[in-house]
Structures are given as C-alpha cells and as structure tokens.
C-alpha cells in the first residue's frame, strides 16, 4: 500500500483488526480512526478513538451526580454483581447511601423497595447494570413507588446499549426523569436531506449506526479540509452534527480520545439535553 497519499485511515471496524493495523510500522505516522466500536482499542501513536470511552463517560457522570446530590437526598444504589466496584465508588462519594442487590432472576424485593423509598426527602436512585432484565424490572418497581408524596429520580453512570431496547418504556423513564450521559443524542433527523436520500435509496430511515457513520465522516472531512491534518484539527475543539459530538483530546503516546458527550434526561415522552 502506498501510504504517502493517505490523510487518514478509518477502521477496521473490529477492535482486534484495528489493533493489528495500528501495530504496523507502515502506518505509524498516519492517523487511524476507530469508528464504531465502544470496546477499547490499543492507544498507539496516531490512534483516534472516536467513541467516547466508557470510563470517561462514567467519570463525568459521577462528577454530575456529586453536583446535584446533597445531604437532603435519600440516595439508593441498585447494582448487579458485575458493577460492585461502581457501587463501592458511589458509597464513598455518598456515605449515607443505601445499597440494594437484585435477587436471582433480576428483580428487587418489593417490601425492601417500599421500606427504602421515603416521602420525607427526595429519592435519588442510581441503577448500575447493563442487563436488560434488571433495567426493566427495577425501573418498573421503582416507578410503582412514585406518588405525590414520594419524589423519585433515576440515574445511571453508564448508559449501555441495553437501555436502548425498544421493549423498555419511555413513559416510565420520563416519569422518573431518567438522567444519564451518552456519546450520542437520539433526536429525530427524519426531515433532513441525508435522511430523505437514505430512505429513497434503502427504503428505511437511517439507524443509529448509519447516522453515527455519517456524522463521523463529515467531521473528519471538514477537519482535514480546514486544518490540513487530523492531528492539528484538535485545536478546533468540540464539533457537533446530527446526533454526535467530537472533541478529541490527547491521551498518551500521541493518541487521542473523543471527549464529546451529551447529558440527557427523559422528559414528557421525549429525551432532552440538559446543561452540563
């Protein structure tokens, strides 16, 4: 491959294949963009991780929770067995917090939920799981406690793909003011030229991955055309397109990660962006 004429390389899509390419000396001086996978890639020279890393999003959400939760709140943490380290970190951040562990079958004991959610102070519940079954059962049980006397808000420090399952009720999440960080904002683009052309060609509206790919390519093209190189384009700062933000910052060994994100909340059957 003649690498002299390459401004950048996008992909491969699979993490294993991307790591192999980034390890090759022939490509060491060429920017290499990891496009779609949320799995961490090897951060070698010239690597751009375009998906905001999970640990970064979690750190930012912890900072947000610290700003909005105080001693007047009743903090309850619901964490499964794979997220006990986050439970511990939350306990250290909120010393008065109470932990609830799901039972076998991913449900919460109704009597325990009823006794821990109070009407004397706001209830701030933090759900730490990436399992659809627990998200569904826990959010439903928590919603059943909501009343004029009991004020409940729901949060998570990491909004994984399980939360996007179409079988989950947006109405339920709206009732709980479910708040989280995300590397994308699922607002409608149905009337845009891109969406119309996509439907005309493929017969269906673009999904999350198609929109992500479009936003990423447009961003990379604009960065190179205006700044001559991807490395120098980090001086631009944050950019935003249909559903995605890009804010590349140095990581290590001349690599870069995207620290663009949205702080989102379910409200009135919709998802809105709130101030960070």
Please state what every model-predicted region is.
Residues 6, 18-22, 58-62, 87, ...:
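Extracytoplasmic/secreted envelope proteins and their assembly/folding machinery
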């Amino acid at each position: 491959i003649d690498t002299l004429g390459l401004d950048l390389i996008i992909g491969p899509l699979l993490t294993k294949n991307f790591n192999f390419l980034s390890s090759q000396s022939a490509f060491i001086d060429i920017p290499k963009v990891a496009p779609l996978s949320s799995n961490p890639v090897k951060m070698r020279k010239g690597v751009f991780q375009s998906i905001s890393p999970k640990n970064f999003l979690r750190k930012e959400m912890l900072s947000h929770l610290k700003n909005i939760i105080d001693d007047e709140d009743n903090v309850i943490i619901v964490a499964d067995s794979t997220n006990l380290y986050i439970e511990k970190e939350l306990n250290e951040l909120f010393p008065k917090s109470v932990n609830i562990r799901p039972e076998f079958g991913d449900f919460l004991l109704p009597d325990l939920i009823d006794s821990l959610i109070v009407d004397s102070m706001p209830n701030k519940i933090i759900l730490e799981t990436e399992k659809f079954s627990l998200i569904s059962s826990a959010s439903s049980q928590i919603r059943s406690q909501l009343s004029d006397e009991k004020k409940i808000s729901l949060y998570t420090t990491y909004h994984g793909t399980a939360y996007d399952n179409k079988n989950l009720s947006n109405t339920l999440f709206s009732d709980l003011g479910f708040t989280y960080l995300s590397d994308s904002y699922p607002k409608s683009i149905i009337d845009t030229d891109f969406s119309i052309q996509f439907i005309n060609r493929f017969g269906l509206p673009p999904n999350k991955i198609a929109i992500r790919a479009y936003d990423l390519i447009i961003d990379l093209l604009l960065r190179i055309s205006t700044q001559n190189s991807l490395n120098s384009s980090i001086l631009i700062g944050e950019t935003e397109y249909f559903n995605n933000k890009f804010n590349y910052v140095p990581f290590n060994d001349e690599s870069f990660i995207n620290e663009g994100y949205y702080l989102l909340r379910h409200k009135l059957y919709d998802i809105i962006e709130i101030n960070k």
